[in-house]
């Protein structure tokens, strides 16, 4: 193992991109996509400070999808946590959940809980 190879890998910045698909709740008018975008811009911490995204993190909105792109490291768990926090704040956490929609787990989707299965069990 050479030291030169490690220095090359360290100098190269790896950008990560995550997408939150909110099409179902936005179509049903349960939530507004603009409010989630604003919430993420205010709450994402960079360097220990919330709201100071700078050039390292960008948030873009396209119809019913929000894309968060980071130049350095960015935790997918942190994005899921903030999305859940938004749902709880707007009292829709009881109906919606955040699910990783693909194998790479860079696409999150807001889906409804499957209530039809639970109704049959409660009647017993």
From Swiss-Prot:
GO terms for molecular function: mRNA binding; structural constituent of ribosome. Pfam families: Ribosomal_L22e. It comes from the Eukaryota. InterPro entries: Ribosomal_eL22 (IPR002671), Ribosomal_eL22_sf (IPR038526). One of its GO terms (cellular component) is plasmodesma. Disulfide bonds: none annotated. One of its GO terms (biological process) is translation. Keywords: Ribonucleoprotein, Ribosomal protein. Belongs to the eukaryotic ribosomal protein eL22 family. PANTHER family: 60S RIBOSOMAL PROTEIN L22, LARGE RIBOSOMAL SUBUNIT PROTEIN EL22Z. This is Large ribosomal subunit protein eL22z.
